[in-house]
C-alpha cells in the first residue's frame, strides 16, 4: 500500500518505489519495503528496507561525486514526516531507456550469456571462465529498461548507440565504469566485493547527463564478502540474491518456470534479508543504520 501524501500528486508506482510531484521541476522518490525477484513483486515486506536503500544511495552519491538528480538532503523540509528517511527530493529528468550495468565478475545473466556464446553483451571473453571469475577490466554490459512485469534484455553497445546516439552512448559507458570502479575500490577496503551493479541516467533541461534513481543498493548490486571469495562457486551475498536463492530452493516449493507467482517469504528469510541489507550498509559506509533518520530510527 502506497503512502497517501496529501500535498503531492502521485505519478507512478514501480516495483519498489513510488513517485510524486513536488513542483514543476522536482519529484519525491519514495522507497517502500517491497522486494521484487524474477520480475515479480513478492507478497512480503522487508522491514526498514526502503530506509536502508535510501541511506545507501545517499552515502554513495556523496562518495562517487558524480552529477546526480538529488535536489535536497535526506531531511529536506519538503519531505513529509511519514516517509522521512525513505524519500528524496530529486530533479525531474528525461530518463534514458538504457539500464547501465557494470560487471567486475562473471555471474547472473552475464554467466548465462557467456555459457551460450562466449560473449557478454557482444563482448568476446576468453575461454575457461567460471561462475564468479574476475574480469581483467570491468565491463559495460547494458540492458533494455523493461516495463513492469517484463524482462530486461541484455543488449550490445552498438544497440545503445542506435538507441541514444554515439555521443550519449559513450558518455553512458564511460560514466558507468568510472563510478563503478570508484565505489568498488572503496567497498574492497571495507571487505566487500561489488561484483556488479546497474544505474539509470537522465538528462536535465540543458541536456546534462545525471545519475538517477538508486545507486549501489543491495537491490541493484551484488555484494560478496571478500574474505570468502572463490571463483567457480556461487558466492555468499549481502544482497537480493539471498532471496532469489530461497525462491529457487526446494524449501520454497516454487516452480520458476511455471505460471504461478512466488510464495510469501517465511519469517526467517525476511529477518535474514533485513540483517544482510543492514550489514552491507554499515560495513561499506562505516555508519550505524540505527542513526539514520525517519520512523523506526
From Swiss-Prot:
Which family does the UniProt entry place this protein in?
Answer: Belongs to the SAICAR synthetase family.
What biological-process terms (Gene Ontology) are attached? Answer: 'de novo' IMP biosynthetic process
The record's keywords, sorted A to Z, are: ATP-binding, Ligase, Nucleotide-binding, Purine biosynthesis
Q: What organism does the UniProt record list as the source?
A: Mycobacterium marinum (strain ATCC BAA-535 / M)
CC terms in the record's Gene Ontology section: cytoplasm
Q: Which GO terms describe its molecular function?
A: ATP binding; phosphoribosylaminoimidazolesuccinocarboxamide synthase activity
Superkingdom of this protein's organism:
Bacteria
Q: Return the protein name.
A: Phosphoribosylaminoimidazole-succinocarboxamide synthase
- Pathway membership: Purine metabolism; IMP biosynthesis via de novo pathway; 5-amino-1-(5-phospho-D-ribosyl)imidazole-4-carboxamide from 5-amino-1-(5-phospho-D-ribosyl)imidazole-4-carboxylate: step 1/2
Q: Which SUPFAM superfamilies match?
A: SAICAR synthase-like
For the keyword ATP-binding, the answer is: yes
Per the UniProt entry, the Enzyme Commission number(s) are 6.3.2.6
Report whether Nucleotide-binding shows up as a keyword of the record. Answer: yes
